[in-house]
Amino acid sequence: MDASPEPQQKGGTLVLVRRQPPVSQGLLETLKARLKKSCTCSMPCAQALVQGLFPAIHWLPQYRLKEYLAGDVMSGLVIGIILVPQAIAYSLLAGLQPIYSLYTSFFANLIYFLMGTSRHVNVGIFSLLCLMVGQVVDRELQLAGFDPSQDSLGPKNNDSTLNNSATTLIIGLQDCRRDCYAIRVATALTLMAGLYQVLMGILRLGFVSTYLSQPLLDGFAMGASVTILTSQAKHMLGVQIPRHQGLGMVVHTWLSLLQNVGQANICDVVTSALCLGVLLAAKELSDRYRHRLKVPIPTELFVIVVATIVSHFGQLHTRFDSRVAGNIPTGFVAPQVPDPKIMWRVALDAMSLALVGSAFSISLAEMFARSHGYSVSANQELLAVGCCNVLPAFFHCFATSAALSKTLVKIATGCQTQLSSVVSAAVVLLVLLVLAPLFHDLQRCVLACIIVVSLRGALRKVKDLPQLWRLSPADALVWVATAATCVLVSTEAGLLAGVFFSLLSLAGRTQRPRAALLARIGDSTFYEDAAEFEGLLPPPEVRVFRFTGPLYYANKDFFLRSLYRLTGLDAGHSATRKDQGPEVGVSNRSLVDGKDLGSVSSGAGLVVPLAFGFHTVVIDCAPLLFLDVAGMATLKDLRRDYRALDITLLLACCSPSVRDTLRKGGFLGEEQGAENELLFPSVHSAVEAACARREELLAADSAL
C-alpha cells in the first residue's frame, strides 16, 4: 500500500492516509467472471432475466388502481384519438398506405407497454423516421422500375404496376404492384433497423446513443422538418411534380414547385389555407391556455372529421379533381416474412435509421425520467424499441421510435404508467376493425396540413440558435452544420455531418484547453488563475501551472507551448544550449516576460536565460483526466529538461488513475520514495515543499 505524500491533519491530529491497493483483474478473468454470471441457471436468475426483458411484469402487480387508472385511461384515449389522424397523415411521408401506419401504431404501443422502462414515453410513428423510410422506399421503387410520379395514396394507384419502359431489378416482381413492393421495402428496412437496435441492446451499447449530442439532434430535427415541409408542399397546392431523390432534394423540389405553381388545384389551396388557419390558431390558443385546459383539444381529429364530411357530400374529388386518401381496408392482413434480398440492399440505410430512432428514444426516456424522479435503462430501451421494429415488421409495419409531442400530451393528460399505451392501442384497434373506411374521401391536402403543423416545435428551435451561440459557439456550429446539410444535401448526410462536427468540436476542446498560471488567494491554501482574478499572491520563485484538459497525443505540443509561454522559458531549447556550452550564444536576458515562444520545434538563434526567476514548476493535475503514451513521454522529457536546468518539476492533485499511469510509465523512476517527493495531494503542499527544499539548499550552501 502506498502512503500519501504527506499526512493529513484533522482536528489538530496528524492522520496517515493510505491508498488501498488496486484490484488488478486481467481481461480474461473479467470475461470469465461475466460469462459465468450470465450463464448461471437458477430460478432467481431466470425471474430476473424475464423481469428485465419485460418490466411490466414487475410494475403491474404494484399498480395503484385508484391513483393511476383514471389518468392512464384519459391519456390513453386522448393519445389514441390523436394517433388516428397522425397515422393517416404520416403515411404520406413514408409513401405507404394509411392502413400500415395504423398497424404500426397498434403494435408499437402494445410491445413498448411490455418492454419499456419509461412510464411516460409514447413510442409509435415519428415524422423524422417516416421521412427516412419514405426516402428509401422512393429510391427502391425507382430502382425497381416503378413510375416515381405515382403516389401510394388514392384510388388511381390501386392498379399501379411496373413502368413498361423500365427493367425490373427484382425477379418475380411483375406480380407485385407498387403498394405491395413499397411495404416490402419498408418492412425489410424496419427489420434491419430493429435487429441493429436489439444487437446494440444485447451488447450493452446504450451509451453509444449519447454521442449524438442535443445540438446535433435539434439541428437534425430542424433540417429534417424543412425537408418534410418541402415534401408536403405539393400536396397542399395540389401540384403533381416528380419526387426528387438524392443530393439537393429540397432545392430541386422547390424549383419544380415554382415551375408548376400555375397548375395548382384551387380546391386544395383553399382547403389547405383553411386547415392551416384553424390548426395554427388552435395550437396557439392551446399553448397559451394549456394550464387551464384539463384535456388538450384534439384539433386534428375535428379537422379531419369536418374535412371528410365536406369532401364526401361536396364530391370534391369528382368535381375538382382533389386527391383523397382512397380505400382504407379494415382488419389485419396475414403476416409475411420481409424479403431477405431487399434487407441486404437497405442494410446501410437501416444503420442511420436505427441510430436516430434509438437516440431520440433514449434521450426522451432519460429526460422525462429525470423530471419525474425515476430511472430508466438505456440498454433495455434499445431492446424495447428494437422489438417494436423487429416483431411488427412481420405484420406490415414500419420503423418507430419515441415521439416528443405525443409524450408531452400523455403527461399533460395525467399519464402515470404505460397502461395508457394499451388504451391507445384499443382506440387504434377500433379504427382498424370498424372506422377505417370512413376516411375514404379525406383530402390529402388536409393530411399534409396536419403534418406541417406538427413541425411547429422543431421549426421553432431556430429561435434557440442565438442563445446557443452565446453559450457555446462550437455547439451552435454543430447545429448549423447538421441542419444545413440535411436541407441542402440529404438527411443521411446531415446526420453524418452532425457526427463529424460533434467529434471535431470535442477534439478541438481537448486539443486546445485553457492553460493558466495560478497564484495564492490571500493566506488560504487555495490557488486560482492569476490572469482572471486580482489581488492574488504568486508564490515566490515557484510557477504553478494548470492545464484544464487531458494530456494526450493531440495536445502535447500545445501543452508545452502553453507552459513555455506562461513561464517564459523553453526548457527543451534551454537544456540543449546548456549542454552545448556558452559558445552557442547564451544571453543574460531573462525570458520571464510571458512572450509567445512560438512552435516547440527547434530553431536557430534562441536566447537562453541564465536567471530564470524560479526554481520549481508545480503542475496542477486536478483537471488532468488521463494520460496516454505521448502525454507520459512529454512529462518525462519535461522533467529531464528541467532537471538539466536545475529546476524541479512537481505534480499536485493527481487522480488515482493518473498516479497509476505515472507509476507504470516510469515517470517516478526506480528510487525509493520518489512518489512522495514528486506527487503531492494539493497545490499548496507542493509549493510549501518546494520552498522548504530551497531553504534547505540555501542553508547548506551558506554552511559551506
UniProtKB/Swiss-Prot annotation:
Annotated compartments: Cell membrane; Basolateral cell membrane
InterPro entries: S04_transporter_CS, SLC26A/SulP_dom, SLC26A/SulP_fam, STAS_dom, STAS_dom_sf
Bilayer disposition of the protein: Multi-pass membrane protein
GO biological process, one term: oxalate transport
Residues with glycosylation annotation: N158, N163, N588
Segments traversing the membrane: 68-90, 94-116, 185-207, 260-282, 295-314, 347-369, 382-404, 417-439, 477-499
Positions where Phosphoserine occurs in the chain: S587, S590
Disrupted-gene phenotype: Mice exhibit hyperoxaluria with hyperoxalemia, nephrocalcinosis and calcium oxalate stones in their renal tubules and bladder. They also display hypersulfaturia, hyposulfatemia and enhanced acetaminophen-induced liver toxicity.
PROSITE patterns: SLC26A, STAS
Gene3D superfamilies: STAS domain
Principal location: membrane
Gene Ontology annotations for the cellular component aspect, listed alphabetically: basolateral plasma membrane; plasma membrane
One of the Pfam families matching this protein, by short name: STAS
Record's catalysed reaction(s): thiosulfate(in) + sulfate(out) = thiosulfate(out) + sulfate(in); 2 hydrogencarbonate(out) + sulfate(in) = 2 hydrogencarbonate(in) + sulfate(out); oxalate(in) + sulfate(out) = oxalate(out) + sulfate(in); oxalate(in) + 2 hydrogencarbonate(out) = oxalate(out) + 2 hydrogencarbonate(in)
GO molecular function: chloride transmembrane transporter activity; oxalate transmembrane transporter activity; sulfate transmembrane transporter activity; sulfate:bicarbonate antiporter activity
Reported tissue expression: Expressed in the heart, cecum, calvaria, brain, liver, skeletal muscle and kidney.
Modification type Phosphothreonine: residues: T13
Highest rank taxon of the organism: Eukaryota
Keywords: Anion exchange, Antiport, Cell membrane, Glycoprotein, Ion channel, Ion transport, Membrane, Phosphoprotein, Transmembrane, Transmembrane helix, Transport
Stated family: Belongs to the SLC26A/SulP transporter (TC 2.A.53) family.
Role summary: Sodium-independent sulfate anion transporter. Can transport other anions including bicarbonate, thiosulfate and oxalate by mediating sulfate-hydrogencarbonate, sulfate-oxalate and oxalate-hydrogencarbonate anion exchange. Mediates sulfate-thiosulfate anion exchange.
Stated name of the protein: Sulfate anion transporter 1
